Amino acid sequence: MAHHKSAIKRIKQNAKKNARNRHISSTLKTYIKRVREAVEAKDKEAATVALKAAIPVIDKTATKGVIHSSNASRTVSRLTKLVNTLG
């Protein structure tokens, strides 16, 4: 256990950040999963709706620094490409 006051504070801050980041990451994965499931079911309408819901979540996750902005762009691009294959 840390002895310095600043180290104790850092441990608390890191625990808070970790919990917040885990929640955001989990939410992000759920939205991505919904898009992929709709595509697997070959439901163009549901996939489009799921994608429109997922894009702001992906962008917000990148803005908060949980994922890198390039990762967010790549994910959006791949999901959009996937939905567009349904024609």
Swiss-Prot record:
The keyword Zinc does not apply. Pfam families: Ribosomal_S20p. One of its GO terms (cellular component) is cytosol. Keywords: Ribonucleoprotein, Ribosomal protein, RNA-binding, rRNA-binding. SUPFAM superfamilies: Ribosomal protein S20. GO terms for molecular function: small ribosomal subunit rRNA binding; structural constituent of ribosome. The keyword rRNA-binding applies. Residues 1-22 are annotated as: Disordered. GO terms for biological process: translation. Belongs to the bacterial ribosomal protein bS20 family. PANTHER family: 30S RIBOSOMAL PROTEIN S20, SMALL RIBOSOMAL SUBUNIT PROTEIN BS20C. Binds directly to 16S ribosomal RNA. This is Small ribosomal subunit protein bS20. It comes from Pelobacter propionicus (strain DSM 2379 / NBRC 103807 / OttBd1). The gene is rpsT.
